[in-house]
Amino acid sequence: MLRLLRFSINQWDQEVFELNPSPDPKAIWQTVLATAYQEYTAAKNSDRSHRDGVVVTPVEIVDFQVRALKDSLAAQGATLADPRVEILDPFGGTGIYCARIMQLSGLTPDELDDLYHYRLRMIEIDPIACQIADANLKTVFEEETGRPPRRSIVICTNTFTIPTGMEKPHV
C-alpha cells in the first residue's frame, strides 16, 4: 500500500502545482488519502471496485457542496452550529465530506465539538475504509479543535439495510 500512496502523492503533487501554485494542504491530504484507498481497492479487488463504484469525489466538488450547504443554511438564518442541523454521509468512504465540513465550517472549537459528537455521522460498508475514515476524522477534529474526540462518528454498515431509527449512533 505504501507504494500506491507514494505514487499517488507524486502524481497529485505534479497535477496540483500545475493548477494552483499555493494549494490548500488540508485539501491535498484528503485527496491523497482517498486516491490511495481507491487505488488500493482497485488493485486488491477490481471486481468489487467496479461493482460497488469505489470512486473518489474530488475535493473541489466536496468543497463546493460544503460552501453551498453553508450558503443555504445562511439563507435560512442558520449555520452549522445550529442544533437543528444534522449531517449524515451515507457513503462516507475515507471521510472526505465530513473532514471538509469540519475544516471549512468556520465554527469555534466548542461549536465543532457539538457538531462532531452529536450531529455529524458517516456510514460506510467497507471496514478498511471505515478504519481510514475514523483515523482521518479524529485527526481532523483534533487539528481543528485542539482536543481529542470522545468517540467515533463512523458507522460500519450497509446504508441500504439500516432499520428505521438506527441511523443515529447511541452516545
Give residue ranges: language-model regions.
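SAM-dependent methyltransferase catalytic region
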Residues: 1-171
